[in-house]
Amino acid sequence: IEAETYFSYKDSPVLLLEIVAKTYDKSQQENLVLKSNRAKIMKSGDVVFNGDVNIVTKSGVLHQLDTEELTLLTESNQIKSESEITYLGINEKITSQGMEMNQDSDTMYLNGEVKIKQDFGPIIKTTNLFVNHYDGNKIYQSKGRTVYSSEDNTVSSEQGIDADMNKDLLNLLGKVNILGVSGSTIDSFNLTIDQSNGGEVFKSNDLVHYQATGVNIKAKKMYYDVPVKKLS
């Protein structure tokens, strides 16, 4: 542990400012690097970080967080928080009710209720999200009920989401319902939302049931370009 400023008070945890903490595996190879403006060393040896925290994994993956408390558990080789987490992505901000991470992993688990707010408008609500940035990937996965909301539609999925943010592809799993602002509904399965090039295209290769005032259509697959209002 390195810090620019060190405060030690009787019967209180050691306070560190501008801290850099490094963890090592059994062969003394560097695992994680954690950086924060402020941290405390508890009597147990655990280190509690406050505020902005940057975590760099063994393979160089960067996780940027803001939280009231995040604890480096020295005995279990885990990082954990039971406070609200704000996770900063490149084009999105994610909030959750806590987080867990093993020191030798590139995957972070954001637990409880999770909200992903994309910079260009859509909001995704789900639970218990896995964030995987290994080998340059940017994968978000959840098996919980997921709701995607944009300006024109609200999409609900019963079996979760598998999102590849590098490719701007969101896969909503299982039974899916699309509710349009006009009141129209589309029921299908395993929906892909393609956000590439600033667009919003809904695709499904499963059975589709479209309903609107005076309209009832069933089809074997669907392609819906939302910005141009073209459904085929």
Predicted regions and their residues:
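Mature-chain termini and adjacent capping regions
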Residues: I1-S232
